[in-house]
Amino acid sequence: MKIGVFVPIGNNGWLISTHAPQYMPTFELNKAIVQKAEHYHFDFALSMIKLRGFGGKTEFWDHNLESFTLMAGLAAVTSRIQIYATAATLTLPPAIVARMAATIDSISGGRFGVNLVTGWQKPEYEQMGIWPGDDYFSRRYDYLTEYVQVLRDLWGSGKSDFKGDFFTMDDCRVSPQPSVPMKVICAGQSDAGMAFSARYADFNFCFGKGVNTPTAFAPTAARMKQAAEQTGRDVGSYVLFMVIADETDDAARAKWEHYKAGADEEALSWLTEQSQKDTRSGTDTNVRQMADPTSAVNINMGTLVGSYASVARMLDEVATVPGAEGVLLTFDDFLSGIENFGERIQPLMQCRAHLPALTQEVA
């Protein structure tokens, strides 16, 4: 099973709590995180894109770096780990993304890929005057289909004459082209999102579900597997989890309860309000899960709370789910979390037993 790190491109990572570590996103922090992840044989690193935060006491995600420029920098200071940036497709023409991706492919030596997102939080785009109207919610995957067609043209042949409802290319050129086939990843959980991923993505991210219920996402992975069977493609699921680990189950649980007790209710109210704006994509979207009050303090990603041995056992359970090819991990404290994962958790995981011994110093 592949292991990735979801780097904290926004302040405070993924805990919306006054009791969680409070920090700003910087290149130096993310450099240390990704170099440490590479040392411990993580397979990939991904950064999101967020253009406006949730506010509140913690100013959650009010402070964010930009994904492509951050990952270009990280590509230059790593050598093996795969690097993925996220394109907010309403903000960037596909021809520009194609050229930026080809550039980072050159920087990384073929280790780069692109995560495509349609956008769900209206204020991110309204503040710039580029929100296309609420009809976009029902047409966003039509838009993304044209977008990826242009990308594929330019990466494949260096030229596009695509004509569609959203994009018109007229002998559009990109050169040099990527040195290897460019991977495209997505995070669709709605029916439309999964259908798109089944046609165009190399793999699809989905949320884990619940606390210490590592296989509860299985129905989502099964839906993705079924959608991919309809297209004859192999599109695996990569599952998002937060790891909160300590020496004992009780110590880890105490940390989790402490974070929940400090939940930033003002920021969470903003998230809930924004999740209700899209009335056209159904009830199974990512943002609907993020705003579920059950565990909104960490946007309802699957949460693995326990001793190092308990977390290792639960991750091995994840690997048994059909269609699950990897996990994307966040941590309450990224630097110590990755080190503890590499030293205390990963060596206990049967699904990672194939890894070579650690031989180099952490940067």
UniProtKB/Swiss-Prot annotation:
InterPro entries: Luciferase-like_dom, Luciferase-like_sf, Pyrimidine_monooxygenase_RutA, SsuD_RutA_monooxygenase
Function field: The FMN-N(5)-oxide reacts spontaneously with NADH to produce FMN. Requires the flavin reductase RutF to regenerate FMN in vivo.
Enzyme Commission number: 1.14.99.46
CDD domains noted in UniProt: Alkanesulfonate_monoxygenase
Family from the record: Belongs to the NtaA/SnaA/DszA monooxygenase family. RutA subfamily.
Catalytic activity, reaction form: uracil + FMNH2 + NADH + O2 = (Z)-3-ureidoacrylate + FMN + NAD(+) + H2O + H(+); thymine + FMNH2 + NADH + O2 = (Z)-2-methylureidoacrylate + FMN + NAD(+) + H2O + H(+)
Keywords: Flavoprotein, FMN, Monooxygenase, NADP, Oxidoreductase
Presence of keyword Transcription: no
Organism expressing this protein natively: Escherichia coli (strain SMS-3-5 / SECEC)
Induction behaviour: Up-regulated by the nitrogen regulatory protein C (NtrC also called GlnG) and repressed by RutR.
Protein name (record): Pyrimidine monooxygenase RutA
Organism domain of life: Bacteria
Disulphide connectivity of cysteines: none
EC category name: oxidoreductase
UniProt-annotated binding residues for FMN: I49, K50, N115, E124, R140, Y141, S190
Single GO MF annotation: uracil oxygenase activity
BP-aspect Gene Ontology terms: alkanesulfonate catabolic process; nitrogen utilization; uracil catabolic process
